[in-house]
Amino acid sequence: MTNIRKTHPLMKILNDAFIDLPTPSNISSWWNFGSLLGLCLIMQILTGLFLAMHYTPDTSTAFSSVAHICRDVNYGWFIRYLHANGASMFFICLYAHIGRGLYYGSYMFQETWNIGVLLLLTVMATAFVGYVLPWGQMSFWGATVITNLLSAIPYIGTTLVEWIWGGFSVDKATLTRFFAFHFILPFIITALAAVHLLFLHETGSNNPTGIPSNMDMIPFHPYYTIKDILGALLLILILLALTLFTPDLLGDPDNYTPANPLSTPAHIKPEWYFLFAYAILRSIPNKLGGVLALLLSILVLIFIPMLQTSKQRSMMFRPFSQLLFWTLIADLLTLTWIGGQPVEHPYIIVGQLASILYFLLILVLMPTAGLIENKLLKW
C-alpha cells in the first residue's frame, strides 16, 4: 500500500516540499538560510502574537504597555526581547540568503528571485512599522523622518504624507494603523514565502558550481532535514545568547525615553539592519535624489539577472567576480558603519564614496568582470 504521505492531498504537498524533494547532493551550509528564515518568521509571529495580547496601540499607553509587558507579564521581558532580537536574526539570515544568491547565481531563477526581492521589501516594511510601536523617542522620530521622505514626491507628496499619518503629524492615528500593518504584514510574508517556495520547486535548487545537478540528486529528508536542524540550533543558540546576556546590544538607548514631539534626539538613526540604506539616503544632498537612491539601493536587486554577462552562472570559478563580490560586502559594511555616524567630516565624504562604489560595483564593474572572464576562458 502506498504511504499516506504520498496520497493524502495535504500531506502530499508537504511531502513534495520537505521530504521526497530531490535536492543537489553538493549544496553547502549557505543553503541553510532559507529554512532559517522560515524558522525566524514562525518565531516572530508567535512572539508577536503574545506581545499583541498585552500591547495597546494608543499614544498615551503604548510606552507603558511595553513596560508592563517587561515588568508584570510572566516571562514578558523574554518574549519582548526574543521578538526584538529575533528581528535582527531575521535580517542577518536575509542578508546571508541574498548574498548566497548573488555569489552562486541563484538569481537566474527569475520568478523566485523577484518574489524574494518583494519579500525583502515586505520584511523591511514590517520591521519599520514594528519599530514605531514601543513609542519611544527613536520610534516617534524614526516614523516622522522616514514617512516624511514621501513628501519629496512631486505634486502629491505632502498630501500623501498626511494621508499616511492620518493627520498633520505622527500621532494616535499613525500608531494605530502602524499596529494594524505590523499585524497583517507577517501573514502576507508567509503567503509570499509559500509562492517563493512554489517557484523554487518548479526549477529545483541551484548548487555551488552553478552547473545543472539533475543527474546527482538526493532526497531532502533525511540529508538536509538534519543539516537544517543543525543550522536551526545554532540560530536559536545565538538568539538566546543575545536575548539573555545583552538584550539591548542592538537597540537604541533613546527608545527608553517616551516619545516627545517637542524634543528631537541628537542623532536620529534606524536599527542596524537599515543603516546601509540610510547612509545612501543621507549621502545625497538633494531630498528627492536621496529618496530615489534609497529606493534604488534595494530595487537594484531586480536588475541583477539582466546584468549577468558571464557564461558561468556561479562565481565559484570566477576570481575577478569574487574579488568584486567581497568588495561589495566590505562596501556594505562601510555604509552600515557610516549610517550610524553623525553627519560631519569625514563621514560625509566616506558615505558618498561608499554609495557611489555600491552602485558602480553592481551596475558596471561586476558585469564588466563577467565579460573579461569570458575572454579569459578562451585562453
Swiss-Prot record:
Binding-site positions, heme b b562? 83, 182
- List the PROSITE patterns: CYTB_CTER, CYTB_NTER
The positions annotated for binding a ubiquinone are 201
Effect in UniProt of substituting residue 246 to A: In strain: Isolate gulf of Mexico
- The regions listed as transmembrane in this protein's record are 33-53, 77-98, 113-133, 178-198, 226-246, 288-308, 320-340, 347-367
Q: Which cofactor does it need?
A: heme b
Name the Pfam families for this protein: Cytochrom_B_C, Cytochrome_B
Q: Which residues bind heme b b566?
A: 97, 196
Question: What additional remark is attached to this entry?
Answer: Heme 1 (or BL or b562) is low-potential and absorbs at about 562 nm, and heme 2 (or BH or b566) is high-potential and absorbs at about 566 nm.
* Subunit-level organization: The cytochrome bc1 complex contains 11 subunits: 3 respiratory subunits (MT-CYB, CYC1 and UQCRFS1), 2 core proteins (UQCRC1 and UQCRC2) and 6 low-molecular weight proteins (UQCRH/QCR6, UQCRB/QCR7, UQCRQ/QCR8, UQCR10/QCR9, UQCR11/QCR10 and a cleavage product of UQCRFS1). This cytochrome bc1 complex then forms a dimer.
Question: What is the designated name of this protein?
Answer: Cytochrome b
Q: Give the source species.
A: Tursiops truncatus
